[in-house]
Amino acid sequence: MATDFLFPKIADCSYVSCYCEENVWKLCEQVQRTRPEELSKCYAVFVSNEGRTVPLWRQKAGRGDDQVVIWDYHVFFMHNPLPNRCLVYDLDTTLPFPTYFHKYVTETFRSDLALRPEHHRFFRVIPADTYLIEFSSDRRHMRRPDGSWIKPPPSYPPILSNTNMHCLGDFICMSAGKGPGAVYSLSEFVQYFYKSPHVVAQHNK
């Protein structure tokens, strides 16, 4: 891999376990601050489905040799600077940081064909600049009924937009036509973002 990564070291990234949506927001913020010319090529990607049961492999929280886990949702960061160069930055994966799109999708999501329909994955892809403006979370989803934390929150204040106290559900929702960005099935997601070098070469002739 080349070394012109947006985030050379995972240790230099803001990270709090179980707050993936905020971790990715912080990555977008870092690009806006340090590499603003690249922000338009970056995306926040939410993974979920109607039942909020999505299996992912190669996750630090996963079990067994395949490190599989079932999340209610997950969020990762993508940088797509060229047609045949899309990199995924997932702070919760056991794959390299970053990983090329095709390898990440193949090892993390595998295929929907072997899964029950209720476990099929959908992807809400939001441009990074939109995510920075519209995302807002007061972290209520991480509190128990008695007000205690399910997992300790980040030390910085909640990320709040000017218009909404808590809109996390709009990002997790996978209904087309609702919420920011665009929603894709797994096959649509791959078709949209994966361009093999051969296909790109043919297109450029």
UniProtKB/Swiss-Prot annotation:
Reaction(s) catalysed by this chain's protein: N-terminal L-glutaminyl-[protein] + H2O = N-terminal L-glutamyl-[protein] + NH4(+)
Gene3D superfamilies named in the record: Protein N-terminal glutamine amidohydrolase, alpha beta roll
Subunit structure: Monomer.
A single cellular component GO annotation: cytosol
Function: Mediates the side-chain deamidation of N-terminal glutamine residues to glutamate, an important step in N-end rule pathway of protein degradation. Conversion of the resulting N-terminal glutamine to glutamate renders the protein susceptible to arginylation, polyubiquitination and degradation as specified by the N-end rule. Does not act on substrates with internal or C-terminal glutamine and does not act on non-glutamine residues in any position.
Name of encoding gene: tun
EC number per UniProt: 3.5.1.122
Sequence similarity: Belongs to the NTAQ1 family.
Residue positions of the active site: C20, H74, D90
Identification of the protein by name: Protein N-terminal glutamine amidohydrolase
